[in-house]
Amino acid sequence: NKKSEHFWWFSQLEMKKDQNGTHEIQKGIVIYNSPYTSENQFTINYQQQIRDSISKMYLKGTTKDSYMISRNDDLAPMQSEAMYINDKYVFKTTGAWKMVNDKMGGPFINYAFLSKNNREIINIDGYVYAPNFEKSKLIRELEAIIYSALN
């Protein structure tokens, strides 16, 4: 777990067996905030940019010069949805992440919303790394945790 003034990272590691051996599963939630300056911050492009800059700074891999970034290509396009949750505007982004200079990746889900004083955007990001295992249940678990934080 890592923490700074505008960044919190919580992760859970577990080992799980399948027919090919034992594999690491990681579920993580990352919370970060940034100044709110424009409605344009609630776009896929901006959300990818801020997510990738935070990830490059804090979500490092074990391989030298490795860090997490979002994928947004033909094979793994990011998707977004604007919604209201308890009268709060929320911009939801889903997609896939990968490690630069390493061979890791998986799904992520991100919720961006304004702080109570409307001066900051708060992002709550959940990601899963689970090679050889179904990831949809794991990402739904994180989504439930994130959703409860929005209530």
Residue ranges of predicted features:
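Secretory pathway targeting signatures of secreted, lumenal, and periplasmic proteins
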Residues: 2-60
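A short, polar/proline- and glycine-enriched secondary-structure boundary/capping micro-motif
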Residues: 20-22, 102-104, 133-138
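Glycine-rich, often proline-containing surface loops adjacent to acidic residues and nearby aromatics
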Residues: 28, 90-92, 120-125
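Short, flexible beta-strand-to-coil junctions
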Residues: 14, 34-37, 96-99, 126-132
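Signature of long, low-cysteine stretches enriched in small and polar/charged residues
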Residues: 52-118
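Generic preference for hydrophobic/aromatic residues in regular secondary structure cores
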Residues: 28-33, 80, 108, 124
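Surface-exposed amphipathic alpha-helical segments
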Residues: 1, 119-151
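Compositionally biased, intrinsically disordered low-complexity regions enriched in proline and serine
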Residues: 37, 47, 59, 68, ...
